[in-house]
Amino acid sequence: MGVVLFIFLVLFPLATLQLDADQPVERHAENKQLLNPDERRGIILHALRKRCCHSSWCKHLC
C-alpha cells in the first residue's frame, strides 16, 4: 500500500512536471517557423547590425 501511495504521490507528479517544462520551448520554435522568410531575414540583419558595445566602452573588442 505504501509503495502505491509513493508512486502516485511522488513519482507521478514528478514525471508530469518534467513534461510540462518542454512545452514553452516547442511553442517558441513553432512561433519562429510561422515567420515568413522576409521577416526572418529582417530580424537576422537587424541583429547583425547591432554592435556588442558602445565605442566609448571598447575600442578593439567589437
Curated annotation (Swiss-Prot):
One annotated GO molecular function: ion channel inhibitor activity
Leader sequence residues: 1-17
Listed transmembrane segments: none
Tissue distribution: Expressed by the venom duct.
KW Secreted (keyword) present: yes
InterPro entries found in the cross-reference section: Conotoxin
Pfam families, sorted: Conotoxin (PF02950)
Localization per record: Secreted
Propeptide, residue positions: 18-51
Keywords from the named record: Cleavage on pair of basic residues, Disulfide bond, Neurotoxin, Secreted, Signal, Toxin
Disulfide bond entries: 52-62, 53-58
Zinc as UniProt keyword: no
GO cellular component: extracellular region
Highest rank taxon of the organism: Eukaryota
Record text about domains: The cysteine framework is I (CC-C-C). Alpha4/3 pattern.
Family per record: Belongs to the conotoxin M superfamily.
Function according to Swiss-Prot or TrEMBL: Shows excitatory effect on mice by intracranial injection, followed by rigid paralysis of the rear legs and recovering after 30 min.
Protein name stated in the entry: Conotoxin Mr1e
